[in-house]
UniProtKB/Swiss-Prot annotation:
InterPro entries: LAMTOR1/MEH1. Residues 1-43 are annotated as: Disordered. One of its GO terms (cellular component) is late endosome membrane. The gene is Lamtor1. A lipid is attached at residue 2 (N-myristoyl glycine). It is a lipid-anchor. This is Ragulator complex protein LAMTOR1. GO terms for biological process: cellular response to amino acid stimulus; cellular response to nutrient levels; cholesterol homeostasis; endosomal transport; endosome organization; lysosome localization; lysosome organization; positive regulation of MAPK cascade. It comes from the Eukaryota. The keyword Transmembrane does not apply.
Amino acid sequence: MGCCYSSENEDSDQDREERKLLLDPSSTPTKALNGAEPNYHSLPSARTDEQALLSSILAKTASNIIDVSAADSQGMEQHEYMDRARQYSTRLAVLSSSLTHWKKLPPLPSLTSQPHQVLASEPIPFSDLQQVSRIAAYAYSALSQIRVDAKEELVVQFGIP
């Protein structure tokens, strides 16, 4: 019938062929979708090279994928967990010892020895913030109005013959 969840027992040859191609991409199709025999000799070599390159990329990607859903979390015993944890910690120790340039950097400056008290204190009143902003604006205005007037020449020529 036409329902979303209905199942039909009789499949057409084309449906079976499509399922076969989807399930097994390495199988070569015996018929094209229109029923004609495929002509492999008419394909240009660039197309086959591109297809081979794409197939190799797909194979590399498939070999690098870890199927997390297929991993059995119950199959590992505690001593295996401990061995892996020890192995990871030794790898991290080797990597951290090779990163000596990180150790040479100075630590961040500390403005206070008790930052939790500074963060827990009362916030600065808004009037104080406005006053600081106003003073900064006055200072900027005063600095921008400074002018240098040239009264005489900067380099004086002496009468040397």
